[in-house]
Swiss-Prot record:
Top-level taxon of the source organism: Archaea
Protein name, entry field: Small ribosomal subunit protein uS4
Gene Ontology BP term (one): ribosomal small subunit biogenesis
Family of this protein: Belongs to the universal ribosomal protein uS4 family.
Domain called S4 RNA-binding: residue spans: 103-173
Annotated keywords: Ribonucleoprotein, Ribosomal protein, RNA-binding, rRNA-binding
Gene symbol of the encoding locus: rps4
Organism the protein comes from: Cenarchaeum symbiosum (strain A)
Length: 205
């Protein structure tokens, strides 16, 4: 059972921690999702492994028991947006760690509210600028339920509202400037193109 004061570790290190390709892949994932340490990534891998093991265990059961237990697992995963309503155990086995990391509050806040980087979104979450159904959530790794996505917003009077508005205006101005530069470049290229010589008249017979 173990001592309740000393809970079990929630993550496992990779079997080949010094593999170069693995380390590079981990660093890319950390940057993509704004993770603070590799431990956050290892927790996601451990949770994904647990879910896959549940799916494999169900595949090994008899038909009657499987039909009773399989919908329970699929419904729980559908609630957090990992699989669709019509998913099967094969879809569960095909899940990747990026799918799980994509359901973190930090990731969804970045996409939904328009933060420029995942680290900026993490800062907003940690400092209490994000609410879900009028409830302040300060945990970047919080797994967002599908029905909660529409209730994610900035707290009233948050300084990030001004920051995001300025960022959106700057991005719009940059896109407009890039479009104007492309049009000017295209016009200059057309003006510099040599004019084709007129076709010579056919000799008279």
């Amino acid at each position: 059972m173990g001592d309740p004061k000393l809970p079990r570790r929630m993550w496992r290190k990779p079997k080949r921690p010094f593999n170069y390709d693995l380390k590079m892949e981990e660093l890319r994932t950390l940057g993509t999702f704004g993770l603070r340490t590799k431990r956050e990534l290892w927790k996601a891998h451990t949770e994904l492994s647990r879910v896959r093991n549940q799916a494999r265990s169900l595949l090994a059961l008899g038909q009657e028991v499987r039909e009773r237990k399989e919908p329970v697992l699929l419904r729980s995963l559908a609630r957090i947006g990992l699989v669709g309503k019509d998913a099967s155990l094969d879809d569960v086995l095909n899940l990747q760690v990026n799918d799980l990391l994509g359901r973190r509050l930090q990731t969804i806040v970045m996409k939904k509210l328009g933060f420029s980087t995942p680290y900026q979104a993490r800062q907003a979450v940690v400092h209490g600028h994000i609410t879900i159904s009028d409830r302040v959530v300060t945990i970047p790794s919080y797994t967002v339920y599908v029905e909660e996505e529409g209730d994610i917003k900035l707290t009233g009077g948050s300084a990030f509202a001004t920051i995001l508005e300025k960022s959106k205006r700057a991005e719009a101005a940059a896109r407009e400037a890039a479009a104007e530069a492309a049009e000017a470049e295209q016009a200059a290229a057309q003006a510099a193109a040599p004019t084709p010589a007129p076709a010579a008249a056919a000799p008279k017979q």
